[in-house]
Amino acid sequence: PLPQEREQSTAVSTVSGSLKSSTATFRIRPATHNDAAQIAELFRRAVLHIEASHYSDSEKAAWIQGADNAAFWQKRIGRSCIRLAAQNDRILGFIEYLPEQNHLDCLFTDPVHQQQGVASALLSAVLPQADADKTVTADVSAAALPFFKKQGFILQHQNQIQRNGLVLINYRMILQTDSI
C-alpha cells in the first residue's frame, strides 16, 4: 500500500510518558496536512536547540533552510509515514519513516520535552512496520548518537552533506530488525 494508506490503517496509540516532574499522557498518531505548520516550527526549534558543541549556528541555519515551513512538510506528509506524539493539540515530537527503504528519515522532539520518553515512544511506533530480516537505517545528528545507540542501533559510517557551502556531518546507523 501507499504510505497514505498505511497511515490511515494504523491505530492511534496512547502512551504514558514523563513530562517534567509529572506523568502525562500523549498520543502517537499519524500526521495530517493540518499538522504541517506545527511540525515545521518544532523542527526549527529542535535544530536551533542543539548544542553548539555539535553544530555551529551557521550549520544549524543551513540544516533548517527550506525545511522550516509548512509547505515543505505538507509534501512529506503526503509521501511518507510521519507519526506524531501529541498532547491535546500540541505536538511534542515527530518521526518520519520511509517504509519502502526501511529508513528513518528524521526524529525530532520539542526541546521542552526531550529526555522524557517521547522519542522512544515514536521509534517504538514505527519499528514494527519494518520488514522482517531487513536492516533499518537512519542518518542521525551528532546530538542524537547516544539515543540511537541506546535503542540498539550500530554506527556504520560518517556522512558529509554539502549544504549552502557548508559540510554538515551526520552518521549512518543501522538496526537489524530481527533484534527488535
Where in this protein do the model-derived segments appear?
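Conserved active-site tyrosine of GNAT-family acetyltransferases
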Residues: F148, F153
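C-terminal "cap" of GNAT-fold acetyltransferases
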Residues: A138-L145, H157-I180
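Conserved G/P- and acidic residue-centered "switch" motifs that form tight phosphate/ATP-binding loops
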Residues: G117
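Conserved hydrophobic beta-strand within the GNAT/NAT acetyltransferase core sheet
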Residues: L104, T135-V140
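Residue-level detector of beta-propeller blades
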Residues: I91, L155-H157
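Acetyl-CoA-dependent GNAT
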Residues: P30-H33, E41-V112, L123-A125, Q129, ...
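Conserved N-terminal entry element of GNAT/NAT acetyltransferase domains
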Residues: A11-N34, Q176-I180
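A cross-taxon signal for low-complexity, glycine/charged-rich
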Residues: L2-R6, S18
